[in-house]
Amino acid sequence: MAKIIRIKGEILGKDEPMVFTKEYNVVKEDDALETMYSEMGSKHSVKRAYINVLEVSEISEEDVQSPILKKTLEMY
């Protein structure tokens, strides 16, 4: 069964760290991390070594903050 994973982290190497929070509906926690590294790397042109993951947690559907993920969950 799919889980909702929230990843909090920061991107280093710029003038000041950029803090982010991402949420994913995935089967495994590793899938969420891989997707996050891929998205952040392509969107912000940073290598994985400059992405610092601060927290990875499983959350309930009620705790979802991402509007896109909320709409996706409502469809199912």
From Swiss-Prot:
Listed GO CC annotations: ribonucleoprotein complex; ribosome
Any one Gene Ontology molecular-function term assigned to this protein's record: structural constituent of ribosome
InterPro entries for the chain: Ribosomal_eL20 (IPR028877), Ribosomal_eL20_dom (IPR023573)
GO biological process assignments: translation
Keyword vocabulary terms for this entry: Ribonucleoprotein, Ribosomal protein, RNA-binding, rRNA-binding
Subunit structure, as described in the record: Part of the 50S ribosomal subunit. Binds 23S rRNA.
Family: Belongs to the eukaryotic ribosomal protein eL20 family.
Designated name of the protein: Large ribosomal subunit protein eL20
Taxonomic source organism: Methanococcus maripaludis (strain C6 / ATCC BAA-1332)
